[in-house]
């Protein structure tokens, strides 16, 4: 390399020109941003920027150190990876204590129809674009761009899976990304929820199965989570009307708000199959869903790299298209006794409010959770 005086001078002059151009480009970008923020459409951008700035300080991708179970700060990449793996492996393979079910339930043996093209089209339409891909690196946009050729191929593929009750082995792998809950210590693993990045093609398969299950399974009216045309607003309105009626009648109404701890992660698989069968789901679909959970494996992607792979043997898949409705089925069956004793019990996913005219009845219903394996989060109940 020629380090002559002329070359050094030319290099410095080039540096100054680049800095001036970068400064001009920044100023232009800021001017355009400020102009947009002054408009009605720019309000969303303003809130998005504020949220992003807050999130950057708490994002797992920015947090390169983490605490172990005893509160000691880990700094080496190897120890941080080991801690993330230890935490999620324990979380996703630990069941709450519960009473084992002794009663059997009759399985529904019936023939199921083949997957139709219109079902695949609807599933494709429901899939959002621009989402993070799973280990196979195939985004849903690929199938959307292929149009009818994709519909033809996927319909054939899904029918083979339905017939054999075996999905491709690659779909059993996932990448788990810790997402900060925006509360508590940013260096504590327990303040993160894990979202699995799964194959988009598997999610299409899940949506086809979910659409069929929704047609045969009737979820109770008291469940407001994961149900079409229902929201927290409806649950709040119903509870408010109930309280006003009792106040007008000068009668007692006892309400207990219950948050189930790690309910999504610790649903026993056997409980899932039991609840599906009790809800009248055809045995064919039960076996298909069982196959989705068989030999499932994941790795944790954190700021310092990727952990070693481990098995996931308990709970529902976070980030799955089918899991929300499966959870609704489980909660529907597990809360059946509560709803019979306290007909005003309301649920939004795993958040429950038990209402009764007597305190004794409320306390009795709370004990049912111990039998079903659902553990209360005492800090939020």
Annotate each predicted stretch with a short phrase.
Residues 7-26, 147:
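Short amphipathic alpha-helical coiled-coil/interface segments
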Residues 18, 88, 120, 124, ...:
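Mobile genetic element proteins and their domesticated derivatives, centered on retroelements
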Residues 36-190, 196, 200:
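Surface-exposed loop/turn segments and immediately adjacent short secondary-structure elements
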Residues 65, 130-138, 187-197, 234-274:
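Conserved catalytic palm subdomain of right-hand nucleotidyl-transferase polymerases, strongest
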């Amino acid at each position: 390399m020629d380090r002559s005086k002329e070359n050094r001078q030319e290099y410095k002059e080039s540096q100054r020109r680049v800095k001036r151009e970068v400064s001009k480009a920044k100023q232009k970008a800021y001017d355009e941003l400020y102009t947009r923020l002054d408009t009605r459409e720019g309000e969303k951008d303003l809130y998005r920027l504020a949220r992003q700035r807050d999130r950057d300080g708490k994002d797992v991708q920015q947090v390169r150190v983490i605490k172990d179970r005893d509160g000691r700060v880990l700094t080496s990449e190897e120890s941080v990876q080991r801690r993330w793996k230890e935490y999620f492996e324990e979380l996703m393979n630990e069941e709450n204590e519960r009473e084992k079910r002794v009663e059997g339930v009759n399985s529904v043996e019936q023939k199921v129809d083949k997957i139709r093209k219109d079902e695949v089209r609807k599933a494709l339409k429901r899939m959002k674009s621009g989402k993070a891909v799973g280990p196979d690196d195939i985004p849903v946009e690929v199938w959307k761009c292929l149009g009818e050729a994709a519909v033809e191929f996927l319909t054939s593929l899904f029918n083979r899976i339905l017939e054999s009750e075996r999905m491709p082995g690659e779909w059993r792998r996932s990448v788990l990304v810790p997402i900060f809950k925006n509360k508590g210590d940013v260096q504590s693993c327990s303040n993160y929820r894990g979202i699995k990045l799964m194959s988009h093609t598997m999610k299409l398969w899940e949506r086809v199965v979910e659409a069929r299950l929704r047609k045969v399974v009737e979820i109770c009216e008291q469940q407001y989570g994961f149900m079409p045309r229902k929201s927290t607003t409806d649950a709040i309105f119903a509870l408010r009307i109930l309280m006003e009626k009792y106040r007008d009648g000068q009668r007692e109404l006892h309400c207990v708000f219950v948050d189930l701890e790690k309910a999504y992660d610790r649903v026993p698989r056997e409980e899932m199959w039991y609840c599906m069968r009790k809800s009248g789901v055809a045995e064919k679909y039960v076996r298909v869903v069982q196959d989705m959970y068989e030999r499932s494996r994941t790795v944790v992607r954190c700021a310092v790299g990727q952990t070693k792979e481990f098995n996931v043997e308990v709970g529902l898949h976070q980030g799955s298209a089918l899991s929300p409705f499966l959870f609704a089925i489980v909660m529907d069956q597990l809360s059946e006794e509560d709803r019979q004793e306290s007909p005003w019990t309301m649920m939004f996913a795993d958040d429950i409010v038990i209402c009764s005219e007597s305190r004794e009845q409320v306390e009795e219903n709370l004990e049912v959770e111990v039998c079903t394996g659902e553990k209360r989060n005492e800090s939020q109940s």
